[in-house]
Each structure stands twice: as structure tokens, then as C-alpha cells.
Amino acid sequence: MWFFARDPVRDFPFELSPEPPEGGPPGPWILHRGRKKATGSAVSIFVYDVKPGAEEQTQVAKAAFKRLKTLRHPNILAYIDGLETEKCLHIVTEAVTPLGTYLKARAEAGGLKEQELSWGLHQIVKALSFLVNDCNLIHNNVCMAAVFVDRAGEWKLGGLDYMYSAQGNGGGPPSKGIPELEQYDPPELADSSSRAVREKWSADMWRLGCLIWEVFNGSLPRAAALRNPGKIPKSLVTHYCELVGANPKVRPNPARFLQNCRAPGGFMSNRFVETNLFLEEIQIKEPAEKQKFFQELSKSLDSFPEDFCRHKVLPQLLTAFEFGNAGAVVLTPLFKVGKSLRAEEYQEKIIPVVVKMFSSTDRAMRIRLLQQMEQFIQYLDEPTVNTQIFPHVTHGFLDTNPAIREQTVKSMLLLAPKLNEANLNVELMKHFARLQAKDDQGPIRCNTTVCLGKIGSYLSASTRHRVLTSAFSRATKDPFAPSRVAGVLGFAATHNLYSMDDCAHKILPVLCGLTVDPEKSVRDQAFKTIRSFLSKLESVSEDPTQLAEVEKDVHAASSPGTGGAAASWAGWAVTGVSSLTSKLIRAHPTPVPSDTTVPQRPVPEGNPAPAPALAQAIPATSGHWETQEDKDTAEDSATADRWDDEDWGSLEQEAESVLAQQDDWSAKGQGSRAGQINHPDHKSLESHWSSWEVEGSWDQGWQEPSSVEPPPEGTRLASEYNWGGAEPSDKGDPFAALSVRPSAQPRPDPDSWGEDNWEGLEAESRQVKAELARKKREERRREMEAKRAEKKTTKGPMKLGARKLD
């Protein structure tokens, strides 16, 4: 009945593209573009329409359908699906382009490189070797029209219409009846009386010679043209002549031909072919071989075709990371290939892998990700950054390796615009406060200050008011000179985020104190910044109506537009200090010696001041730092590929243990100021200035003279005067926080950046401290005496044996 009849073409899971057909090999087939209905993936569809009176061609088409369906080889056109009806034949294969069309398109774009042609011919010869040596089949149709190219640039052998068995099963070679194909037949086939001895591969190797001639010289006009090699490379001419020789006996086996061309200096002996051969066998390679291969791959990617990198190298890189435990070595080639991808492809293929990499505990992989974040940050959306990446990145702030801490700080420049309110204004500020106050590496403290200045415009108004002034003020007390410069430039970079009252009462007093800094670079930047703030104050003083315009950004929401200004002010610090940090880390991971981190106050006139050791590494002005940026960047890039050679260890150490260790630092070294100066031991010195409890200890190292002389009797310290008049405390004393030590008030939260953490607390007299210390010593002495008395009166056996008799 009619309603049981169904159209098999309509139910076929593939459909033809409305675009006109691409043509195809001379013969019955017409090549169409197509797609799979379910997924939309691209395919190629070979269509043959059955016509009355063409039974011979129909049998040829059906034989080709059967051969292609049963033959599986990487260099033979891949069969996907097929449809056979009384009216038509459909063969669905991977998406391919005829070689002639491909070469013409590439010629318009500059032509194929010799290495691409060598690999393409290598694939065709390898397919012939498979057919002749493994399957005992004669292709009988090797020509330009029988070769196709997939999207990765891989050459595939098709055109199996006239294939027959080399053993004679099923009769001789089928008749072609197409003049365009018969011109590729070897001369011995044209002479029916010829009794020359030939091998089973002789005819196909002749046709291979014709293919080589056409690849380099264009369409073959006649067989006599084969005598002139034309544009065939010299390294291939000798082997080509063997293929088109009149004696079929001397034509080499396909395997032998490959071996000859792969010899040193041969046409198929190059880096591109070597890379492809390794990728084909990568699943059976040893881990050490894979590591070496991926390390060297990046150098070659620039010379490889873009389609090859996208469609062949990239899948292998993703597979190597997903299942092969390749580690950090895949990152550099992965991101290099990613540059050629469209945004949609990048999101689909690389971003899921990157997100997974951030959860790795491999230090080398983590630092590579941080170093190369600029290449993929634009493809990350905000939810992914806040929920899947930022929580893992913050572990780097607590890492024991200085290089990871530094790269984590730098990465915040890229992540900050995508962070939400909680992560940016709360979580990140906690880590920055801890690094700036406690980190034992001066360059890391410096870069923390620089980073804060660059991302200041992204902070909320309340966070800016609470954090920026206090953080930059603390940086100006750092014994590391570049940190003090960074603090000054931080004020300058964020000048539009402060009210006029803050400029006059909080910022200018701090900057004025730096005009007598021992380092000229600090003094120079301080004077420049002071003039900038004074000009603003003066303009508002002359015209008070400008106040609203000047302070428009103070209470505004985050304003990313000012980030560029911040970057230009402080762009020198990240690069310049990065190279210094790298040198320190490569030399030894221990902290910098105290005599280089704590500059001394200049000696009086008349005595030549010794040049500090750090002066060689610290430039005199910020302009010089900018000139060093290119050289430092080159040095960092030169050393970037050496991270795998170092023993990074694991990140499995709990963050709590690191925090506990840092809290222990703050409990050490509560000695006197004189002790800080007279003892050059670096560890004890660091414990003083890195403590959260000691507010002013960063500036004590260089504000004190090199030799401490007792003041005349009766002399009072400046901070002991009541500058405010009637008030007994130092509430009105703006200088008290610079010279006195905090009182024994409740300790502030070390993870907070509130005002109480940064402003000076009420001073405690030295007599009270001495009295407390004396009481503790007396109490300890009494405890020890009581224990000794108790031991003397104890009778009976002791813990480790019987009591000796008198």
C-alpha cells in the first residue's frame, strides 16, 4: 500500500548543501558538500545517479562503494555512511576538497610550502604501500583527481572505482573508457604485445610519477611532458626519474620509495614530516619522549600551516593533557595554537582545559598559567573567573615559592576587571594586606603596591577610601627603596580618587616626609607628586566651584577608565622588579640580606657615604626603570621555558599551615629599636618590620643614624610633647604615628585593611615595658626556684631508676 512506502533519501541522516557541487574525479561521481542533520557537522557526499543503459558505470560505482566501505587506513578517504537505492548511490565521507581545487586556492594565497607538499606525497605513497603490500590491491587510478585534502591539510587517497586484485581474483583491471584517466596509464599497457617483466606495483608507481609532476607543474598535457622535471625539487628528481622510467622492473616498491626519500637530506626528511610521524604514533611513545617533543614543538609551530595546527596539533595537545599527564609542557604550544582560533572555537576547546588546569597542584603548570594569562583572559567570562579560577589562584598568595607569589600578584591586573564585589573588595584586599605587610621579598611587596595602584579604579568607593591611603602610606615606610617609590607613584596614579581633605591632611604629610629619603629616586618622585597634589589644591583654592568636578571620582562607583592612567604611572615596577625577583630566586630562594634591604641614613657632610649594595640594582629615577622594561621582559621570556627544569614540589601543603607560619613571624623579635640597628641578622630584622603589631618599624631602619648616641640628660622625644595643647593623648599629634610603638591594645585582624591596622596607636612608655619585662623575669625565676626545691625534697625512686643510697 502507498502509505507504507518511504523515501530513503528523505530519511537519510545527511543532507546535501544547497551550494553547487564541487565536481569530482572524472567518472560517475559528483562531489557535494553536506552536513549531518543531527549535529550540523560538515561532511562530503559523493552522489551517483543511476541512468538507463549505463550498467557498466553502475557496476563500477557499486564496486567503489564496497571498496571504500571495507578499507580503513589513515591515508585513505574515511567512509562515514552510505545509501544505495535503485535510483542513486550516496557515499558520505569526512569533509574534503579535491586536491586540484585545494592547490588552486592555496596558489592564490601564496602557494604551498615544500614541506607541506612533501608530507602530502608521503601520505599518498604510504596509502599505496598499504594497498599493494598489505592488501594485494592495485589502485589503477592514481592521479590528481583521486586525491582529496581534509580541513587539516592531510592528503587522502580516493577514487577506488577501478581497483582490482593483484592476485588475479575477480578478473583483470576494469575498463575505464574515460580519456582523461587513460593518459596516466604506463606505456607497457598500451603495447599489447609487450612481454616485459613487471612488478604488481609498477603501474601505480608510474601514475605516482604523473601525480608528482602535476603537483609541481600543473595539469599534465601529454605523457611526453614527463621527461622534463620542470619545477620538481632537485632532492626529488632522482627518485622521480625512477618512477617514470620506461622499464617497469626498475620502478621501486612504494615502501622502498618512502625509505629513499626519507634518507638524510631527502625530500621527505624535514621537521614537518618528523612532527606528523610522531603525532601518528604519540599514543605508544614513552612519557619522556612526549615531554621532549612538546618542549620543542613551540619553536616549529610558526612555520607550520595554520590549518594543520588547528585541526591536527591542537587535538593532540588536548588529548595529551587530558589523558597523557603531559603537564605544563603542553601550555606553551597550546596557547600558541589558540591564537589562530575564533572566539567560539577558543571557548569550546581551550577554556574548559584551562579551567581544569587551574585546579592542578603542579607548581610548574600553575606558574605557566599565570605567566600566560594574558593570552586567554579575554575569553573567560565573569562567572567562570569568580567561581572556578579565582579560588584556585588565591592559593598562590600563600605559596612558599616567591616566584609563584609574584606571578599571582601580577595576574590580578588581568583578573580584577572580572571579579565580583566580594572577591575584589574583600578577599583580594586581605591577601594584598598580608603580602604588603609580611612578605619577606621586597620586590613582591613592591609589586603588590603597584598592582593595588593599577586596580584602584575597580574598587568600590568605600574600599578605596579605607584602603588606598593607608596602603600607600605603609609602602612609603618600606626599607626596600622601590617599594617606597611604588607607594609614591601609587598616590600619583590614583590622585583623582582622594578628597581634597585627604590630600591635605593625610597624603601630603606622608609625601613631605619622603623629601629627605636616602634614595634619590624616592625623593624625585615625591617632589613630582607633591607638586601635582599642590596644583590641585591651589586650583580649588582659587576657584572653589571646581571642587565638585575635581572630586567627581571620589564617591563614584568603580571607574575602569582610569586604569590606563594607573598603568602608565606605575608600569615600570612590575617589569623592573620582576627581573630582580627572578635573579634573587635563581641565585637562592632565601630573603635578601638585611644590609641590602635597609638603607642607612646619609652620613654628615665631610664623610664620604659608602654606596649601598642595592644601589646597583635600583635605578635612580623612574625614567631609567622604563628604559629597562624591554630588557627585563626579554630576560623573563628567555627564562620562562626553564621552569620545568626546577624542582617545584607540590602545592598540597595546607593554606592554614602557611598562615600559621606567618602569624609566628609576627610574634618574633619584640626587641628595642637599638637592637634592630645593631644586629644585622636578617631574620630578626625581618621579624620586626614584617610584624603587624609594629606600625612604624619599616622606617626605623633608615631614620635612625648609623651610630646611636644617648641623648643629653633631660632631653625628651618629639613624640612625648603634647602638641595639641589640652588633650593628654596624641589624638591631635599627626607625627605620633611615625615615632612611637603601638600600645597593648587588642591586636587588629591581620586579614583586614581597616584604618586601625595602619594608623598609629597610643604610645606606651618604655618604663612600663621594662616593668612588665622585669615582672615576667621575676615570676619565671620564682617558678624555677620552686621546682628545684620540690625536686630536693622528693624521696623515693626517680623516674629513670632507683634513688641511690647514701
Curated annotation (Swiss-Prot):
Coiled-coil features, chain-numbered ranges: 755-795
Region (Disordered): 586-642, 663-806
HEAT repeats mapped onto the chain: 350-388, 389-427, 507-545
UniProt note: domains: The protein kinase domain is predicted to be catalytically inactive.
Subunit structure of this chain's protein: Homooligomer. Interacts with GORAB. Interacts with COPA, COPB1 and COPB2. Interacts with AP2B1.
Disease implication from the record: Defects in Scyl1 are the cause of the muscle deficient phenotype (mdf). Mice exhibit progressive neuromuscular atrophy, hindlimb paralysis, gait ataxia, abnormal hindlimb posture and tremor. Pathology of mdf comprises cerebellar atrophy, Purkinje cell loss and optic nerve atrophy.
Protein name: N-terminal kinase-like protein
Organism: Mus musculus (Mouse)
Upper classification of the organism: Eukaryota, Metazoa, Chordata, Craniata, Vertebrata
